[in-house]
């Protein structure tokens, strides 16, 4: 059983509201959940404190036992400072030059080997 940390949609039409939940990968988006870890209200202002609320200790626990966050939740956790960012890949130019891909740190911009 693979466990994901993902968003479950609540609210009504044109007024979305999401819960950050732990659920089995094969369950439906709004289906059975193992645990609720917080909420996300996309219609609140960006600087509003009520936009995102997360239970940091429970998220750390689920990440430690192998739960995989979805891309959206992963970006939320990065902004909250819980996980490091994914390394970015820089691809060479298309002008016929030798193309080499290099990994770049998204925080410092340094090339990683």
Curated annotation (Swiss-Prot):
Gene3D superfamilies according to UniProt: 3.30.1320.10
Recorded GO MF terms: mRNA binding; protein domain specific binding; structural constituent of ribosome
Residue segments, region Disordered: 93-113
Tissue: Expressed in leaves, stems and flowers, and, to a lower extent, in roots.
Effect of loss of the gene: Embryo lethal, arresting development at the transition from the globular to the heart stage of embryonic development.
Transit peptide: 1-15
Bias-annotated ranges (Polar residues): 94-105
SS bond list: none
GO annotation, cellular component aspect: chloroplast; chloroplast envelope; plasma membrane; plastid; ribonucleoprotein complex; ribosome
Coiled-coil region(s): none
Additional comment: The chloroplast also encodes a gene for bS16c that is transcribed (AtCg00050).
Family, per entry: Belongs to the bacterial ribosomal protein bS16 family.
Protein name as annotated: Small ribosomal subunit protein bS16cy
Organism (species): Arabidopsis thaliana (Mouse-ear cress)
Protein encoded by which gene: RPS16-1
